[in-house]
């Protein structure tokens, strides 16, 4: 294991705990007399202007669309390294998280529809449990970081990022009312420029980040989730330079402390404050929250593990070294933490309908994600190697 990865795991252990603490603080504030202060903080207007271009958004969206793009940049860098040189190198190993992610989207959606398919309003939320909150899933795993094999963490990263990309496509196809073709065209041009820079051997990460910032603006204006820009830039920054140094690893090393100690805890604080006003005991067993919760803590592991197991048995994919099927199952349960991505889809699915749909969908997401987090953590403790 490289020194950078060792440092990353150490950072995550502390950062994961900080993430959970800030999430709890946010949940308390959102359901207490401090709710007003919490909402005022998230709704602070932040404007950035460059010539004729102006982006004016509340702080919450700057955190979710802007700062989280940096997190996804690091995820892209790490997954690329493992695909080229690490535990996912080779077609059969690289296919493994792809197949797992497909199962992790299909099964929860089907289970949700078993509960809600007959209701014309609630069935619009079929994609809610398809999402995995990569930040919170990593945060829980980070609590056991010294025992987690690098290969298992990379599997979670790869699976979750493919899952998120799939959800972004779902949002674009089924939940985006207006898409700017001009902005999409400019996004494609920026991606082409990044590909050309990589092909020409440009090694300066500052050049990639500059083009990446423009790409981020273009994707934001297109109506597609802007964090996609971070993944794209991460995959296109060169892994190895001409003199043997690694531009991508140097960038990872510089950004990791900021992500672990600032960006992810701030993200948790901004998004975990789910207000539960108007919730009743009878509503807890309604088909909407129940369908979401069951789809997350049961559908996710069912889909991920079954698709993974079958792909291995038929020889279509190969289990990465140093990890076993018990650990894969534990991680698949952890992927049931849908949380912020699920809440985002919920807002799109039930936009313009009665507020109770939004309240009870958030409740279902909170229940399912919490159960998945505790179950996933408990299973990981059981199946991971003991400390030496």
Curated annotation (Swiss-Prot):
Q: Where in the cell is it found?
A: Cell inner membrane
Say which domain of life the source belongs to. Bacteria
Segments crossing the lipid bilayer = 8-28, 33-53, 59-79, 95-115, 125-145, 154-174, 179-199, 217-237, 259-279, 287-307, 328-348, 363-383
Q: Which InterPro entries match?
A: Na/H_antiporter_dom_sf, NhaA
Reactions catalysed, semicolon-separated, are: Na(+)(in) + 2 H(+)(out) = Na(+)(out) + 2 H(+)(in)
Key words of the record = Antiport, Cell inner membrane, Cell membrane, Ion transport, Membrane, Sodium, Sodium transport, Transmembrane, Transmembrane helix, Transport
Gene3D superfamilies referenced in this protein's UniProt entry, alphabetically: Na+/H+ antiporter like domain
Task: Note the topology in the membrane.
Answer: Multi-pass membrane protein
**Which terms under GO biological process does the entry name?**
regulation of pH
Major location, coarse class? Answer: membrane
- A matching Pfam family: Na_H_antiport_1
Q: Which GO terms describe its molecular function?
A: sodium:proton antiporter activity
Q: Which residues form the signal peptide?
A: none
Function per UniProt: Na(+)/H(+) antiporter that extrudes sodium in exchange for external protons.
PANTHER family on file:
NA(+)_H(+) ANTIPORTER NHAA (PTHR30341:SF0), SODIUM ION/PROTON ANTIPORTER NHAA-RELATED (PTHR30341)
Question: Which NCBIfam families does the entry link to?
Answer: NhaA, PRK09560.1, PRK09561.1
Q: Which family does it belong to?
A: Belongs to the NhaA Na(+)/H(+) (TC 2.A.33) antiporter family.
User: Protein name, please?
Assistant: Na(+)/H(+) antiporter NhaA
Q: Which organism is it from?
A: Photorhabdus laumondii subsp. laumondii (strain DSM 15139 / CIP 105565 / TT01)
């Amino acid at each position: 294991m490289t020194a950078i990865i060792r440092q990353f795991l150490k950072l995550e252990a502390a950062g994961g705990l900080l993430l959970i603490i800030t999430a709890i603080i946010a949940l308390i504030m959102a359901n207490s007399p401090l709710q007003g202060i919490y909402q005022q903080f998230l709704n602070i207007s932040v404007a950035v202007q460059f010539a004729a271009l102006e982006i004016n958004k509340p702080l919450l969206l700057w955190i979710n669309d802007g700062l989280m793009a940096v997190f996804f940049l690091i995820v892209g860098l790490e997954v690329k390294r493992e695909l080229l040189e690490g535990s996912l190198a080779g077609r059969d190993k690289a296919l493994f998280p792809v197949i797992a992610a497909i199962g992790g989207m299909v099964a929860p959606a089907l289970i949700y529809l078993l509960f809600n398919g007959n209701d014309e309003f609630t069935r619009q939320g079929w994609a809610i449990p398809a999402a995995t909150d990569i930040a919170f899933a990593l945060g829980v795993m980070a609590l056991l970081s010294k025992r987690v094999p690098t290969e298992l963490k990379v599997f979670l990263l790869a699976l979750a990022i493919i899952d998120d990309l799939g959800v972004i496509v779902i949002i674009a196809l089924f939940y985006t009312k207006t898409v700017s073709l001009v902005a999409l065209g400019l996004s494609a041009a920026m991606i082409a420029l990044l590909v050309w820079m990589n092909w020409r051997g440009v090694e300066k990460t500052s050049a990639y980040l500059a083009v990446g910032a423009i790409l981020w603006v273009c994707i934001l204006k297109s109506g597609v989730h802007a964090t996609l820009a971070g993944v794209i830039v991460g995959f296109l920054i060169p892994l190895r330079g001409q003199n043997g140094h690694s531009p991508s690893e140097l960038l990872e090393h510089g950004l990791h402390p900021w992500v672990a100690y600032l960006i992810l805890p701030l993200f948790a604080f901004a998004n975990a404050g789910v207000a539960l006003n108007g919730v009743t005991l009878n509503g807890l067993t309604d088909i909407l929250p129940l369908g979401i919760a069951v789809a997350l803590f049961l559908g996710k592991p069912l889909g991920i593990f079954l698709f993974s197991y079958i792909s291995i048995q038929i020889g279509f994919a190969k289990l990465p070294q140093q990890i076993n099927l018990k650990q894969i199952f534990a991680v698949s349960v952890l992927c049931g933490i849908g949380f912020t991505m699920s809440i985002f889809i919920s807002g799109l699915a039930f936009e313009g309908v009665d507020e109770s749909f939004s309240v009870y969908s958030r409740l279902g997401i909170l229940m399912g994600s919490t159960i998945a987090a505790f179950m996933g953590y408990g299973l990981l403790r059981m199946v991971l190697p003991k400390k030496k």
